[in-house]
Amino acid sequence: MTPQALADALIDRGLDPAEREAKRTLFTQVLDAWAHARRDPPQHAWWVPGRLEVFGKHTDYGGGRALVAAATRGFAVVAGARTDAGVRVIDAGRGDSFELLPSPLTAAATRTEGLTGWRRYVDVAACRLAKNFARQELGADIVLASDLPPAAGMSSSSALLIAITEALGRIGGIARTPEWRQNIRSPLDAAAYYACIENGRSFAGLNGDGGVGTHGGSEDHSAILNGVPRHVLGFAFVPSRALGAARVPDDWQFVVATCGVKANKTGAAREAYNRLSADAAALLDLWNGRGAAGARAISLAAAVERPDWAETLRAMSGPLEPRLQHFIREDARIPQAMEAFTRGDADALARLSRESQADAERLLGNQIPETIALVSAARKAGAFAACSFGAGFGGAAWALVETRSAEHFCRKWGRDAFACRPGPSLIELTTTK
């Protein structure tokens, strides 16, 4: 297990070859930190990508659709079992570590109070697995490093949680348990379960807890676990369904840049994020509480799937009407965008991205001056389509440009802009038996 071999294996699985040296450097960081912590080699290595959201702002938890891809940036991860029940996670990029000792990984799965930042995600993942798979031995050392821009709307927090969950689950053998086999039957099920670890909800027969405090869906997790190189993927949610994949034309290139304001899901930003989720839930409650027999819905998407139902709910929605309008309009863009990618229709994507950005600003209200300016700058720099993405209240934007001009566009758009060709899903790159 060498950095070069791991990077080469990742390229062989479909990652953009231009990323080879960056990933070799990332795995060098991880393996050097492992060697400093332990004398024996790691047992497992993974690549866990971030998520690029093309369309589908705040639709997933309402049962709507999203168009996403696995990003070219993400987490390099290695892990090995411990002889005790403790969990130690080392962030080789930050030079930081976190240890759950004495371990909370008991039948009680007691959460550690007062944790913030990435430590909270580690604690939540470890304790949820201990609760749902109480008979498994989850003690592990995990070393990771990321080249994702933090809090930029590329799902760095969800990717971290998935990295920890995958590592602990692999070492603990949870996929062989009756609990897993009875409840998780596909990668989409796994993605939905990982989302429930994050948001605290139960999944099928696997009971929930408090999660990390955000009330999100499984869009990010679905992209990370199901990504296809050079393709954008359509999903619908509640329940999760795959809608298909559309290849990004070879002469098109995604470019991503951050606005300079971190989209942290903490404090006021988390409250604003959760308010959008709560508004979607309130609309569903309005529909289901109106007393009409035979028309209860399991999601907001189901409540508006018929035009007459949508009109009925719109008439009832009052101050929630902008939230409803945004959901309906953004959800409808997904099949249109998939068709546009399939046809190579740049004009259609230009229109769809302009409308999505305008609706986020006017109806959803999750944009800030910096994200608005970033999208405007992308268009002025020559992008034929551009849009902000992620939870909002900071973060990043994507732009679509001709591949031949991508390098020049990156320099023109901003110093941190980078090419982001859709890559492979989470991959376990190598194991030792």
List PLM regions with ranges.
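C-terminal nucleotide
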Residues: 1-51, 55, 76, 80-115, ...
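Gly/Ser-rich oxyanion-binding loop with an adjacent helix/lid
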Residues: 2-44, 49-68, 99-107, 111-249, ...
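Short, flexible, solvent-exposed loop/turn segments with mixed acidic/basic and small polar residues
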Residues: 67-68, 385-390
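Catalytic-core region of right-hand nucleic acid polymerases
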Residues: 67-71, 75-79
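Extracellular structured ligand-interaction cores
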Residues: 72-74, 139, 254
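N-terminal pre-core extensions flanking Radical SAM catalytic domains
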Residues: 391-399
